Amino acid sequence: MMKLSLLLGLVSFSAVLASENRRGNCQMCPEGTRYFEKNNLLGRRFKNDVRKLCGDGMSSDVHDESSSHSSSSSDCKPRRRRHHRRYEDSCSFGSSDCDDSSTYSSCVSSECSPPCRPVPLNCDYELKTPIINMGERIFEFLKNYEDQYKKAVVLFLTRILSQIDGFAPSYPSADYEPLIEQLETLGVTVPSNMAADLAALDAAEATSLAGTIRANAQKVIGDLLARVNTMCYLDLMSLVTSGLFASQVTSAFSNTQPIITIAGNDLFTKQMAVFQRLPGTLPSAAITAITNALQANKNNFVTFFTTQTTNLQTDVQNALTALITALTTLTSTTSTEFTQFANSEIGALTGRIFGSSGSGSGGSSGGSSGSGSDGSGSGGSSGGSSGSGSDGSGSGGSSGGSSGSGSDGSGSGGSSGGSSGSGSDGSGSGGSSGGSSGSGSGGESGGSSS
């Protein structure tokens, strides 16, 4: 029977060796290790052979039993360590696992155990991770608001530029035929193309003036738009709320009136030069008629462009007012929404870190007084406390009083108390009361209940 058992043991041992011939490390040969432990084959003298069978690749000489007792614990430590600095292999073991007083089987058992979950080396990440995530969500919220704010300003300036680009009013030229007829009546020879030349001067001066107004406004608004595109939110908000933004927008049309006046004077001068080229000397009546007609045309020219630029400036001012109102509404609404959003984020973090909250209250009061030859006094105290938490709640109170009067003295006292508690693991209540009174020689009584 013993021979049969030995034979079966050898067969099982050979099967284990054949099935476990490919090993990456001891953690891949739990079956073989359990076999060694079960059959008491893990003596210290066989430790190197066992590690070789496990595929550890350890090439150390087999020492005798006496030398194995003096071996250090470094023989049992894994050869490869994790290189991730943030984590430490919780399955690794120190020298206490493999000292001289321990058996090698416990060391191999530790090595061949299933891999454990890495433990964070720095627990600060329990705080850093939720805080970083919360910060990113808050950043996205505020960044979205800042983008909306800036886009509104940029869109406003872009639309203003489009309006300015389309500023090209066509001045209706005056009717010069009555003036030419009047000059001919006064004996002045007038070329047939005189009226056309005067109308051409009107159109040319109108085009030039519109271009000048347009170029000046484009430069002011374009420069402002370029600055806004490079501004951060705080600078842009300061520019808008301070009123500088509105003043810069309106300055695009602030110098148009002098330009219009100068253009009207130039038109008058150019048209007068046309009549001065006529042959001969003009009679004074003809000069007066020409001057009056050209002066009226100049006034009409100035009035026309003043009206056109005023209309454009009014449109821009209305759009500017709408922009300021929209930005104010956006800021107020987003501020309220952000307060709610931030409170919810902080509340979630508070619940994560602190969990359930507790509250407690307590109070005591007392008083004493005395009177009489020997004295009489009374005193009392009362107190109560209560608490609640995730694991239980309790309350208790006590009150007592004593008084005495008389030459010899008489007194009475009493105390009562109660406590109760309830929690997830149990509940209980109890109370006691007692009192005593004496007069003359003395008296005593008491009672308790629970």
From Swiss-Prot:
Region of interest (Disordered), residue spans: 58-80, 357-450
One GO term of the biological process aspect: sporulation resulting in formation of a cellular spore
Lineage top rank: taxon: Eukaryota
KW Repeat (keyword) present: yes
Record's keyword terms, sorted: Repeat, Signal, Sporulation
Sequence repeat windows: 358-374, 375-391, 392-408, 409-425, 426-442
Region (5 X 17 AA tandem repeats of G-S-G-S-G-G-S-S-G-G-S-S-G-S-G-S-D): 358-442
Subcellular location: Spore, Perispore
Signal peptide limits: 1-18
InterPro entries cross-referenced by the UniProt entry: Diverse_Func_Domain-Protein
Additional free-text comment from the UniProt record: SWP1 is a major antigen recognized during host infection and might be a target for microsporidian infection diagnosis in the case of immunocompetent persons.
PANTHER family cross-referenced by the UniProt entry: FIBROIN HEAVY CHAIN FIB-H LIKE PROTEIN, PER-HEXAMER REPEAT PROTEIN 5-RELATED
Function: Spore wall component.
Name listed for the protein in its UniProt record: Spore wall protein 1
Organism: Encephalitozoon cuniculi (strain GB-M1)
Gene giving rise to this polypeptide: SWP1
